[in-house]
A protein has these predicted regions:
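Active-site-adjacent "lid/gating" segments in soluble enzymes
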Residues: 18, 32-187, 191-198
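Aromatic-enriched alpha-helical interface/lid elements that frame and gate functional surfaces
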Residues: 169-254, 258
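A glycine-rich dinucleotide-binding beta-alpha-beta segment and adjacent secondary-structure elements
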Residues: 253-307
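Flexible, small-/acidic-enriched active-site or ligand-binding loops
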Residues: 93, 289-337
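Amphipathic terminal alpha-helices
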Residues: 333-347
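A structured beta-alpha segment of the ubiquitous adenosine-cofactor-binding alpha/beta core
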Residues: 1-43, 240
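Non-transmembrane alpha-helical segments in soluble domains
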Residues: 13-16, 113, 193-197, 236, ...
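Redox-cofactor-proximal catalytic regions of oxidoreductases
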Residues: 1-14, 72-81, 292-308, 313
């Protein structure tokens, strides 16, 4: 839809009168310049909720600064905590994918849902000014609390583990099949430790880990000692001789919270996610041909009372005509004129 045209502006105004929420991510002030700001749209619809998601918010000195997902992660603080501590001079790195945009979208959604709940008992809508920079700055895990409260320290990057204000034991262990496991809390309880040492001893690789001092460490959950570092290195050598899945399954059997470092696509082959939990689902795409479907990531939760269903996203302009006909009572002739004049597209 051409929202710069008078006809497009009128369509937006008409739709805003009958909708619950308006989402937008234009530059600050752009919709107001077209007469489509919240003040105008809510004039005859005080229950309307409108959420604007921008890089730095609608006001302040950064209001008109440009940004990208990478900038959001850099200025928000996430990149400062991501990287390596075993490569001298290594720079911070960004997480894979558009995490900055996802974080911003989640916060925008949470604010919108909160406004909907408030409207349920107040009858009032409101305008939500969401900032990607502020969303990312609010999602730095331990970094901000560690700096704001005693001992008021900055976190530093640690390879394959949480950034922290003090060094923690290296958790990445390589396996014989060139995979990695996250291994930690080896002294979490005595029974698990004894069972782990017995398993290692079956393969002749327990060395002296059956000594009483290590049992005492497990019983007392002792960590951060030279003996603990030594035990971890013995375990690391043992893990290097075993396949990743074997160590993972056995560690879970022994009640250790370890896990395999998987690529996203490896989860597609795990029946726990694909078959038992239904995490992945096939969605039909009839617009591409008969019996054409693709596998998508599903929902990360199961509604027991209202089972979910999934379908493909609408095509661009796929529902434009239907909405104008049914919701705004436009005639077919009027819609055809809007199409021919380039105000809207239909699919």
């Amino acid at each position: 839809m051409d929202i710069t045209s008078q006809e497009g502006i009128e369509i937006i105004k008409s739709l805003s009168k009958i909708c619950d929420v308006v989402f937008e991510d234009y530059d600050p002030g752009y919709l107001q310049s077209l007469g489509l700001g919240y003040g105008e749209l809510s004039k005859n619809h005080p229950e309307l909720i409108m959420t604007s998601l921008t890089a730095f918010g609608q006001d302040g000195p950064y209001r008109d600064f440009k940004s990208t997902d990478l900038v959001a992660l850099a200025m928000g603080g996430q990149m400062h905590s991501c990287g390596y501590d075993d490569l001298p001079g290594a720079p911070p790195i960004r997480p894979y994918g558009d995490h900055g945009n996802y974080i911003a979208s989640h916060y925008g959604l949470m604010g919108t849902l909160s406004a909907l709940i408030y409207r349920d008992f107040s009858g009032k809508g409101q305008y939500i000014d969401a900032s990607a920079h502020e969303a990312c700055s609010s999602t730095t895990e331990v970094a901000l609390p560690a700096y704001l409260y005693p001992p008021n320290k900055e976190v530093f990057r640690q390879t394959g583990r949480h950034a922290g204000t003090f060094p923690t034991a290296k958790t990445l262990c390589k396996t014989v099949d060139n995979k990695y496991l996250i291994v930690f809390r080896i002294f979490m309880d005595l029974s698990s430790w004894i069972a782990l040492v017995k398993w290692m001893d079956l393969h002749g690789m327990a060395e002296d880990l059956a000594d009483q001092k290590f049992k005492d460490m497990a019983a007392n959950r002792t960590a951060g000692t030279e003996d603990g570092d030594y035990a971890m290195e013995v375990l690391r050598k043992f893990i290097a001789t075993r396949p990743a899945e074997e160590v993972y399954r056995k560690s879970q059997e022994l009640r250790f919270p370890w896990g395999v470092v998987r690529s996203p696509e490896e989860n597609l082959d795990d029946p726990h996610f694909y078959e038992d939990r239904g995490m992945f689902t096939k969605i039909d795409h009839p617009e591409l041909g008969n019996d054409v479907s693709y596998t998508y990531v599903g929902r990360p939760y199961n509604f027991k009372g209202t089972p979910w269903s999934a379908s493909r996203a609408p095509l661009l302009a796929e529902n434009t005509k239907k909405i104008l006909l049914e919701d705004l009572d436009y005639s077919n002739e009027k819609i055809s004129n809007l199409v021919s004049s380039g105000v809207i597209g239909v699919n």
